[in-house]
């Protein structure tokens, strides 16, 4: 398994279709933001879309961004759009994305990363 940044990938159209195929409305929203070129406007210029992949399969994805859905706020950065495809759930694969975000945050000198959800007991 490998964690990659969507915007560093040569397979962007492939990964976009995988994100779009998720059974979650926020996945569709993320795909729309990517497709219409407004992702960075929505979440910040330094944002990343992290993908956990195995070959050409997308296992999990999330964002690491300056802004999320709670605005206005001084809190930053945010982990958002956290999703694991159903067939991969229960194996803690998304933890690999969390570890990558923790690594990026440490490199940036950021002591905390925030996550927002309206789901109870999901994370």
Language model regions located:
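Conserved beta-strand in the GNAT
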Residues: 51, 57-67, 78, 83
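Conserved active-site tyrosine of GNAT-family acetyltransferases
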Residues: 123
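A short helix-loop-beta-strand connector motif used in the catalytic cores of GNAT acetyltransferases and
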Residues: 39-51, 78
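Short amphipathic alpha-helix that is part of the acyltransferase structural core
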Residues: 1-38
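Conserved acetyl-CoA-binding loop-helix of GNAT-fold acetyltransferases
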Residues: 81-84, 90-103
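Conserved GNAT acetyl-CoA-binding A-motif
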Residues: 105-117
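Residue-level preference for hydrophobic side chains embedded in well-ordered alpha helices
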Residues: 15-19, 79, 97
